[in-house]
Amino acid sequence: MVNLAIDSYARATLEVDDGGILSVNYTCDVPVGSGLGTTGAINVALLAAIEGMAELGDAERQTVAEQAFQFESLLGNKGGRQDQWAAAHGGWNHLLFIGDDVEKMPFSPIRSAQRWLGKHLVLANTGIPHVSGDLHAMIWERYAAGDEQVREGLMAIRMAARLMANGLQQDRRDEVITAFNEVCRGVDLLDPGLHGPFHSVVDPLLEARNVLGWKALGAGGGGCLVLLANMGRRELVEAACEAAGWTLLEWDIDSEGVSVNAS
């Protein structure tokens, strides 16, 4: 899994009044259900505030990420761990999942590749809400039953992550584009309906070569997506998104991850 933390934030505050009454509040810059990992980020912020972590080294970030994942699971929204890890660590992440263990792989995209993505990657919100746990449930049932199509789709997504990581570290833009397309193929194998809300807008952009690759964010089925615009075509892509009623979101990389301020 390759992911990136961006500068849309979840914030949590914990206060204890003079009578010892504790109150916790949280907010987020983007809607829950948008596919941007908002639930994971909110829970990382919430648990970091409750823990009152004075130091946030790598071990502490891993701890709060896992606590946030387990908290979500208890609430019945069990998905992957990637959103919590991205929120806790910030920046670029290349994650390997082995059972319940998460291994953070060495990963450092070169600046030219990051500048290229910053210039050409369009982030849009369709405004169609989804619940990732609900979307995942049927897929995992099929996986548990030995569905070969689901297994093939998951393998395609896993191999695409390796290709994406290599492409970003070596500025192999052809590999980045191929990785986007392989992820889409893998998702279609899991459930073609996950891409359903996007096709009417995205397919014409692909056919016209205005877009070279794209990806539904989160579980798909609505929420946000990213589109990799061809050189000189970003304005055309943005215009198509806005014509469809989608909201364009400005983004930049957040390299800090979770932080705690005590006062």
Predicted features by range, described:
Residues 36-58:
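DPxDG-like acidic metal-binding loop motif
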Residues 17-19:
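Contiguous domain-boundary segments centered on the initiation and propagation of an alpha-helix
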Residues 3, 10-15, 27, 31-32, ...:
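C-terminal nucleotide
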